[in-house]
């Protein structure tokens, strides 16, 4: 309050709210500024207006948030198969971001966070599903490898480094990072080495699970500022992880055996029934019956399993699914190579038998969809090396003989018949 106004007040002159005109005696509090006054009632009214506007903005965001059906439809464009996993993810992600909107309301019901566990073999699409979700929702996204994490104080990455990576993805915008998605891969590799708690320190197994617990559940993580390293005198960025969606995934090799041990009560000795591979059925069918107790027996600590209420199992990809992956998604490998060759002014054709041969090879290697690019890179290496220096090539044709290594890719030259690249050999 200025000296004149203080004198006015001291001399007994009444002061009035500049907004509603009420005197200082009609309100509980009158706040003074430079040449202006505002009463507590007007402050409360302003707060109500701001709160209503924030709720309207939240509703507008809700309109933009894709519905579960729309989320699944977009996932279908990039990921082949895995329908049940897509449905589970679509519902979980939709509910997570609806939960963020609910924070602005005065409702007493607080919605809990539902982090997600993805279980599926290598190359089944776990990482791609998480990446596609983040791109669809336009939120910061980062991938962390659980095998590189150790407890604080040991050589390796602290769990806080995950949040630092997320901050880097959004130029250290803390508000934006607090609504991001984190995917932690290879989570099965930090399982406890034995079913019973160990008396020795397990810095990359149970210790990391303990360190991840608070981060996943929700805590205030202290992260060094941009480009900084941790030291005692440094000011840290405070990131609230309560609203960050954590998706963790792993292959969980051997989990199917743990599930079968629980579900199949066979006899002992000569009366025991030994089932063939065909009778056991596909591993993915067994994994779909996973229960929290199976994950605990596998080596995840009970508290960690409890922080992952949504569990989605992915199926092992068969040959037909791998062929679809090669051709159908928006960013299918055959389309990517088509674009690369188009930049050289050349068309590339993958025959049907070539696609089947690539899928069969990936099945043999047990690498899933991840192995498809490796196979095509090996097959096309020499062609991609020579093509920029070769003139008059209009088309490259790949058949099953090329994939099996029995022939080199066929080159079609302008105004000529098929000529094998190896014709001069």
From Swiss-Prot:
Disulfide cross-links: none
GO cellular component: HslUV protease complex
The keyword Transmembrane helix belongs to this UniProt entry's keyword annotation: no
InterPro entries: AAA+_ATPase, ATP-dep_Clp_protease_ClpX, ATPase_AAA_core, Clp_ATPase_C, Clp_protease_ATP-bd_su_ClpX, ClpX_bact, P-loop_NTPase, Znf_CppX_C4
Record key words, sorted: ATP-binding, Chaperone, Metal-binding, Nucleotide-binding, Zinc
BP GO terms, sorted: cell division; proteolysis involved in protein catabolic process
Pfam family, one: zf-C4_ClpX
RNA-binding keyword on record: no
Amino-acid positions noted as binding ATP in the UniProt annotation, renumbered to this chain: 121-128
Ligand binding (Zn(2+)): 17, 20, 39, 42
Region forming the signal peptide: none
ClpX-type ZB domain location: 5-58
Gene Ontology MF terms in the entry: ATP binding; ATP hydrolysis activity; ATP-dependent protein folding chaperone; protein dimerization activity; unfolded protein binding; zinc ion binding
CDD domains for the chain: RecA-like_ClpX
Assembly information from the UniProt record: Component of the ClpX-ClpP complex. Forms a hexameric ring that, in the presence of ATP, binds to fourteen ClpP subunits assembled into a disk-like structure with a central cavity, resembling the structure of eukaryotic proteasomes.
Similarity section: Belongs to the ClpX chaperone family.
HAMAP family linked: ClpX (MF_00175)
Function description: ATP-dependent specificity component of the Clp protease. It directs the protease to specific substrates. Can perform chaperone functions in the absence of ClpP.
PANTHER family in the record: ATP-DEPENDENT CLP PROTEASE ATP-BINDING SUBUNIT CLPX-LIKE, MITOCHONDRIAL, ATP-DEPENDENT CLP PROTEASE ATP-BINDING SUBUNIT CLPX-LIKE, MITOCHONDRIAL-RELATED
Name of this chain's protein: ATP-dependent Clp protease ATP-binding subunit ClpX
Organism: Thioalkalivibrio sulfidiphilus (strain HL-EbGR7)
Higher taxonomy: Bacteria, Pseudomonadati, Pseudomonadota, Gammaproteobacteria, Chromatiales
